[in-house]
Amino acid sequence: MFLIITRDTMFFTAMKNILSKGNVVHIQNEEEIDVMLHQNAFVIIDTLMNNVFHSNFLTQIERLKPVHVIIFSPFNIKRCLGKVPVTFVPRTITIIDFVALINGSYCSVPEANVSLSRKQHQVLSCIANQMTTEDILEKLKISLKTFYCHKHNIMMILNLKRINELVRHQHIDYLV
């Protein structure tokens, strides 16, 4: 069984056609996940305009104990699903490489441009969603010094001179 988590109906249709050999289920919100029915599924997540990280959605996915998770994202997030095997791929992956990845064969999938820790991605998502510093500190339960440290590291990784340049960053749509 394949669970396709996306808000993009064109993406789902493409995945359904590629994965025609199996049972393909479209998931748009966390209420549609059935922990018993979808146990040990193969999960494919599209994060474009659908940032499921750091939410109950990801917790639900972890409870499914998926066989493998493929995440379409320009970010590589370290240990985002604990011990569940995760592969990050760009949306520009070829169909041949994607099918090889699904079948467990070797494919030359390019690595994500940006590699972040879970906390860095969480801070970055909060900043992209225009949360105030105080709200971020309260939500993530971190100190101001830790926040500034994460913010500095994120700016270095994304090659930003000022944090307000983030709104024009090429991957901003994957954070909201």
Curated annotation (Swiss-Prot):
The record's induction entry says:
By acidic conditions. Could be induced by EvgA via the induction of YdeO.
Q: Which domain of life is it from?
A: Bacteria
SUPFAM superfamilies on file: C-terminal effector domain of the bipartite response regulators
Q: Which part of the chain engages DNA, per the record?
A: 133-152
Query: The HTH luxR-type domain covers which part of the protein?
Result: 109-174
Q: Which InterPro entries match?
A: Sig_transdc_resp-reg_C-effctor, Tscrpt_reg_LuxR_C, WH-like_DNA-bd_sf
Q: Which UniProt keywords apply?
A: DNA-binding, Transcription, Transcription regulation
Q: Which GO terms describe its molecular function?
A: DNA binding
GO terms under biological process: regulation of DNA-templated transcription
Transmembrane region(s): none
Offer one Pfam family short name for this entry: GerE
Q: What role does this protein play? A: May act as a transcriptional regulator of dctA. Could be involved in the regulation of the genes coding for the type III secretion system in enterohaemorragic strains.
Protein name in the entry: HTH-type transcriptional regulator DctR
